[in-house]
Amino acid sequence: MLKRSAILCASLLVMLPGALLAAPITTLPQHAPFVSTLPVRHTLPPFFDQLEKRTFDFFWDTTNPANGLAPDHYPGPSFSSIAAVGFALTAYPIGVERGWVTRQQAAQRVLTTLKFFEDAPQGKAASGETGYKGFYYHFLNMRTGKRWPGIELSSIDTALFMAGVLFDQSYFDRDTAQEREIRAIAGKLYNRVDWPWMQPHPPLIGMGWTPEDGFIPHSYRGYDEAMILYIEALGSPTHPIHKDAWAAWSASYPKFWGNYYGREQLSYGPLFTAQYSQSWIDFRGIQDAFMRAHHSDYFINSRRATESQRDYAIANPMGWTGYGKDLWGLTACDGPGNFAFKADGKQRQFYGYAARGAGIVGTLDDGTIAPTAALGSIAFAPKIVIPMIEAMQARYGKSIYGRYGYVDAFNPSFHDRNVALNSGTVVPGVGWVDSERLGIDQGPILLMLENYRSGFVWRVMRRNPSIRRGLERAGFTSGWLDGKPATQ
């Protein structure tokens, strides 16, 4: 089975393998109210406090406390996603700073996770392994942590996991036995990733490998979510890739660059490509060669991509129900399923899980809205995200918002109740509403809410020497890399 990220880049559909009953979950008791000591950058309406807490609770409550593995999706039976583990490892310190868990509780959860991955078996065998060459399989059994059958060793998902590992390495900086061990194991996990091995077509980084078939015949190139992959690989103190890799990866940028809804930008379509790397790395004011030549930076670029998606929804060229300034946001997410029938008076094609988006390179839009698309961009474009979320909550909140925040997606144009849905249900007067929440979509909501409110995740990651080394080897200069304050 191809990895989800490779399928997303090709805008194909993902058919997940059979489900696994999730491990028993232990929910820790609620704690006394706490006033955050985080510096206030921007205030938000009270609803967003609740949303951030509920999204944190998703990671704290659904992760297997015995090994730290976070589910790919919940509440349905699920395997673990290593990318979701990376977001979870970042979520725990946010919980500390917001007073939702103690530092010791978070440190223990992190240490449990890191120890599991430190000791998990690595090898070439097709079963019974968690990873190989320092990389990890995209999906793991929630209980055993072993490879989910048929799944690939994933470069990008390993990188998203490692983003959480490096974040914890920098956050847990106290001189205690527990925090020293966190830093030591985090360094060990990162240092043993053999990044050059994952380059069957150097200097590009390949998408993945399986014991059965070897390397996937595609590499990451061009503007997408793989920025963080290349930066981590360039920054490795033990197995770095050649510095020419960034230039090779970005060589195809010209085909992604252009004017989309009145804004010059690198445009890929699904908003997750603009959000994943920037959930951790502060790109405000720092520039590589391409951005220097175009008098921009990746933060500004993501703002323009977000604003263009809103304008696309206002234009609503396909005539989907509800689209406009108060409802927009296309990204990779769940969908009702693969169906073709009449809706809104037109012949329509709907999809299951797919890389929805609108941009220069193409559009895939079936009327499905993912709350993570807008919320993951709140730090880029708060003036349009905040009122959109408030309007969406007022109109659809009773159906799409719950104990762990927003469901993954919903579709106001889909009302057929006589088909076998991939997940979720059709709610009268609302449309299709997913029943699942995905870790890789909950993560950007939590991290970017906190980055907008306090800059916390960005500030911690700016201290990580491997991230700085990777950025500098990629040719980034200016901004906080030169000691200047990061401004929005």
Please identify what each model-predicted range represents:
Residues M1-C9:
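Bacterial N-terminal signal peptides that target proteins for export
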Residues K3-R4, P17, P24:
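N-terminal leader/targeting segments
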Residues P24-Q488:
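Ser/Thr/Asn(+Pro)-rich, low-complexity disordered segments
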Residues C9-A19:
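Bacterial N-terminal signal peptides
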